[in-house]
C-alpha cells in the first residue's frame, strides 16, 4: 500500500472519453477479492485513503461521471480475503484455499457479513444515486441467502 499513489487515476478524462465513445454508463471496482477499498470505508484500514494517494477514488469517479451525464456503476465483491472472519478455507479461488493453516476455525461468518453489509450501505448512501451495482461472487454452497443477499440488495433502494 505504501507505493499506491494513483498518479495516473483520471476519472474526469475517462468520463469524457466514455461519453465521446457513446457510452451510457461506466462500472468501476470499489473493492475486489483482496479486500482493498478504493473508497474511504470506516470499517477497515485497508483502503485508499491510507495510501500515498490519500483520497477517496470512488468519490472522484462518481463526480466525474455525473459531470458528463453518465450513469454510475459500482462493482463490489462479496469476498474479502483480507478480513479476519472471511471463511477462505473452501473458497475455490482463494490463493490459500487448500492450506489447513488457513482453516475457518475462529472465523465468525455473521461478523463478516455484518462488515460486508456495512460497506455496501456506505457505497449506497455516501455517493448519491448508484445506477448499477454489481455484487460479484458466489460459489458452491455460498449462494443467495447464505450471504444474506436480500439485505445488501435492499440498500440499493436507499438513495
PLM features: residue spans?
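Mature catalytic domains of secreted/periplasmic carbohydrate-active enzymes
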Residues: 1-158
Amino acid at each position: 500500500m505504501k507505493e499506491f499513489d494513483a498518479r495516473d487515476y483520471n476519472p474526469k478524462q475517462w468520463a469524457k472519453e466514455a461519453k465521446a465513445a457513446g457510452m451510457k454508463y461506466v462500472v468501476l471496482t470499489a473493492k475486489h477479492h483482496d479486500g482493498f477499498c478504493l473508497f474511504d470505508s470506516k470499517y477497515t484500514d485497508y483502503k485508499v485513503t491510507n495510501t500515498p494517494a490519500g483520497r477517496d477514488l470512488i468519490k472522484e469517479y462518481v463526480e466525474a461521471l455525473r459531470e458528463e451525464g453518465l450513469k454510475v456503476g459500482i462493482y463490489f465483491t462479496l469476498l474479502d480475503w483480507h478480513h479476519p472472519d472471511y471463511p477462505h478455507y473452501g473458497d475455490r479461488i482463494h490463493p490459500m484455499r487448500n492450506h489447513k493453516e488457513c482453516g475457518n476455525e475462529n472465523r465468525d461468518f455473521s461478523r463478516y457479513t455484518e462488515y460486508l453489509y456495512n460497506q455496501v450501505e456506505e457505497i449506497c448512501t455516501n455517493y448519491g444515486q448508484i445506477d448499477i451495482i454489481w455484487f460479484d461472487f458466489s460459489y458452491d454452497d455460498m449462494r443467495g441467502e447464505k450471504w444474506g443477499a436480500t439485505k445488501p440488495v435492499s440498500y440499493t433502494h436507499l438513495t
